[in-house]
């Protein structure tokens, strides 16, 4: 039994980020329903680490539903350096958002977790029941524990107040409006920026690490469509993994090759094995998603990479980098 569809005012935190922009696009392209009012906010509208600003935002908007995307995020190397900052800022943001949603009587909150929060030592594929089964990878334990606490809070809000607060766990998201910063972004947007620079300067492409780790990549526009489905139809408090199938996992080397092909790069490609690989794999099961949506069609990886590369090239000046 899903949400009763009727008058809904949906507040999306982190609305200017990768996933927020994708949801905006999907809604604008026809996924929004009559009676739905979508309100996208970013850090310009309120500092969500500040309880008073967060409360004021929620009092003003009076959302019936919330998609909570706002977070302090960064790539592997920034996480290693600033674990305390990632823990504190995200704990503050999440507590402020969930409690403000509760105070204004929001009927549903869908927060965003990440597969990097799962235990470092685990069996594969990982699934929704394993989140708290052991410590996360040491490289980003601050971010991971802060995100795990959303699941703890969701269960507690349900137990104590009957709230339908839930969370989704996407795998590696990429697409337009990503952070393409080479030092600080995630692997695929970093590769796209690197290939762009190598191509424009006629130099070799150096990929950090061995290229062997494997990842499941999900296109932001596919994730946006799934987020909207979760908001309307998914009524469990337990989280749900949003991902392509295990069979669609690709190596970093294959991802680099897809970017090289999409951007028509003809230079030399080398792998710098002195750089850290991070986790070798974090294969996730999308069995739960498929039990609900057996026929959902994901955008083919190469097509999604091509669309993202085209967006980055066309919007190079404005892109986050």
Swiss-Prot record:
Highest taxon, organism lineage: Eukaryota
Coiled-coil region list: none
Entry keyword Isomerase: yes
EC number: 1.1.1.271
InterPro entries: Epimerase_deHydtase, GDP_fucose/colitose_synth, NAD(P)-bd_dom_sf
Gene3D superfamilies associated with the record: NAD(P)-binding Rossmann-like Domain, UDP-galactose 4-epimerase, domain 1
GO biological process: 'de novo' GDP-L-fucose biosynthetic process; positive regulation of endothelial cell migration; positive regulation of endothelial cell-matrix adhesion via fibronectin; T cell mediated cytotoxicity
Effect seen on changing residue 139 to N: In allele TUM-
Catalytic activity entry: GDP-beta-L-fucose + NADP(+) = GDP-4-dehydro-alpha-D-rhamnose + NADPH + H(+)
Site note Lowers pKa of active site Tyr, residues: 147
Catalytic residues identified in the record: 143 (proton donor/acceptor)
Gene Ontology CC annotations of this record: cytosol
Keyword Cytoplasm: no
Recorded metabolic or biological pathway in which this protein acts: Nucleotide-sugar biosynthesis; GDP-L-fucose biosynthesis via de novo pathway; GDP-L-fucose from GDP-alpha-D-mannose: step 2/2
CDD domains: GDP_FS_SDR_e
Catalytic class of the enzyme: oxidoreductase
UniProt keywords, alphabetically: Isomerase, Multifunctional enzyme, NADP, Oxidoreductase, Tumor antigen
Family statement: Belongs to the NAD(P)-dependent epimerase/dehydratase family. Fucose synthase subfamily.
Other information: Mutagen treatment of P815 tumor cells produces tum-variants that elicit a cytolytic T-lymphocyte response (CTL). The antigenic allele differs from the normal allele by a single mutation in position 139.
Summary of subunit composition and partner proteins: Homodimer.
PANTHER family reported for this sequence: GDP-L-FUCOSE SYNTHASE (PTHR43238:SF1)
Function recorded in the entry: Catalyzes the two-step NADP-dependent conversion of GDP-4-dehydro-6-deoxy-D-mannose to GDP-fucose, involving an epimerase and a reductase reaction.
Protein known as: GDP-L-fucose synthase
Source organism phylogeny: Eukaryota, Metazoa, Chordata, Craniata, Vertebrata
Gene that produces this protein: Gfus
